[in-house]
Design a protein with these regions (language model features):
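Conserved PLP-binding catalytic core of the aspartate aminotransferase-like
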Residues: 286-317
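Active-site C-terminal subdomain of aminotransferase-like
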Residues: 17, 195-277, 291, 360-361
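PLP-dependent aminotransferase-like
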Residues: 79-144
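Conserved N-terminal alpha-helix of the aminotransferase class I/II PLP-enzyme fold
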Residues: 34-81, 88, 102, 110
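Conserved active-site segment immediately N-terminal to the catalytic lysine
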Residues: 171, 185-196, 205
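Active-site phosphate-binding strand-loop segment of PLP-dependent enzymes
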Residues: 12, 111, 122-178
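PLP-dependent enzyme catalytic core of the Aspartate aminotransferase-like
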Residues: 1-6, 319, 328, 332-361
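A glycine-/small-polar-enriched, mobile loop at the entrance of the PLP active site in fold-type I
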Residues: 5-56
């Protein structure tokens, strides 16, 4: 039977490199002569230990992660980190949050359970369509950290310049821009993200944390499983990890290295985004919703200005093999998530379809 792959613009779980999926399919029943699938393998086996260590090393190579940072492969996605971060870092019970979307807001609300969380900047006044000025923030003198969501999946905004945290630890949720471009890890105390947008299958988060932030000194009542030290000391093997997820992430890391690393990946991502934004800026029918200087190269929201026409577009696009273009339920309209694994041809096909739709409507 002839297989037909669609162009999948889902925000997550999202498109994975076809090459990676084919490799995984080939190894599904017999991983490198072991006679079993990685899914069936003991997480304590030599074979799995090699998968885990190789995945970590490849990630370190891609991001140039210094030796004084630990890489943790943790279950629970990004949501679990909303609580883990204050539980591990809120020594003074004070933290500052920059609210640029729904996920930063959820993390902020979670932190309020554990201490005094302050919203020191927000773009909610204009439906999170821009990144607030973060050059002179009212950072709390006793803040344990300053928190951002670096790329906003729902609203399509991105911090292109990191906030001035006035010497405080910067914590960043990079779920939807992870490995989309190079980043200087040393500017952060913690970088973390759910992997299901740009790296692998759902069910896991990667946490990159500076060693001095990993201590026994967590908030009273912190569950054992949510202590970073437990996972760091056990090399992400405190309990059975998401072993197949780690294997798939490892495959994606190798694929990214093969593409030329994150410098090359960034160039390709910018090229894809430019094709879509250039069309949106010249279109009579479609409009982008984000302030130009704050646009994400990963998530591109757009509207026609007519809800019925939006719905018609999404339906007809799906019939044309361009799927998951419906915007998040909180904002409506459309959104094209054009992660690393989205080929250039997919973005070109979307723009051609949009032009055709514009002519007919």
């Amino acid at each position: 039977m002839e297989m037909s792959r669609v162009y999948n613009f889902s925000a997550g779980p999202a498109v994975l490199p076809e090459e990676v999926l084919r490799e995984a399919a080939e190894e599904m029943l017999d991983y490198q002569g072991t006679g079993m699938s990685v899914m069936e393998m003991s997480h304590r086996s030599k074979a799995f230990e090699a998968i885990l260590n190789e995945a970590e090393q490849d990630l370190r190579d891609l991001l140039h992660i210094p030796d004084n940072y630990k890489v943790l492969f943790m279950q629970g996605g990004a949501h679990l980190q909303f609580a883990s971060i204050p539980m591990n870092l809120m020594k003074n019970r004070v933290a500052d949050y920059i609210i640029t979307g729904q996920w930063a807001k959820k993390a902020f609300k979670e932190a309020q359970i554990y201490g005094k969380a302050n919203a020191i900047a927000s773009s909610e006044d204009e439906t999170f369509s821009y990144i607030p000025d973060c050059s002179d923030l009212p950072v709390s003198p006793d803040a344990d950290y300053v928190y951002i969501c670096e790329n906003n999946t729902i609203y399509g905004t991105k911090f292109h310049t990191l906030p001035d945290t006035k010497g405080k630890i910067l914590v960043s949720d990079v779920s939807s821009c992870f490995l989309s471009e190079p980043m200087d890890v040393t500017k952060y105390g913690i970088i973390y993200g759910g992997v299901q947008k740009n790296i692998g299958p759902a069910g896991m988060a990667i946490v990159i944390i500076r060693e001095d932030l990993i201590t026994e000194d967590t908030l009273p009542g912190t569950p054992t499983y949510m202590k970073y030290k437990i996972h760091a000391d056990a090399n992400s093997l405190y309990n059975t990890p998401n072993s197949y997820g780690i294997y798939m992430c490892g495959k994606v890391f190798k694929w990214l290295k093969k593409q030329g690393g994150l410098e090359a990946v960034k160039v390709r991502n910018e090229e894809k985004a430019a094709i879509l934004y250039d069309y949106l800026d010249s279109s009579r029918l479609f409009k982008g919703t984000v302030r130009k200087e704050d646009r994400s190269i990963m998530n591109v929201p757009f509207v026609t200005g007519d809800k019925d026409l939006d719905a018609k577009f999404v339906k007809e696009a799906e019939a044309a093999g361009l799927v998951n273009l419906k915007g998040h339920r909180s904002v409506g309209g459309m959104r094209a998530s054009i992660y690393n694994a989205m080929p250039l041809e997919g973005v070109k096909a979307l723009v051609e379809f949009m032009k055709k739709f514009e002519e007919e409507n």
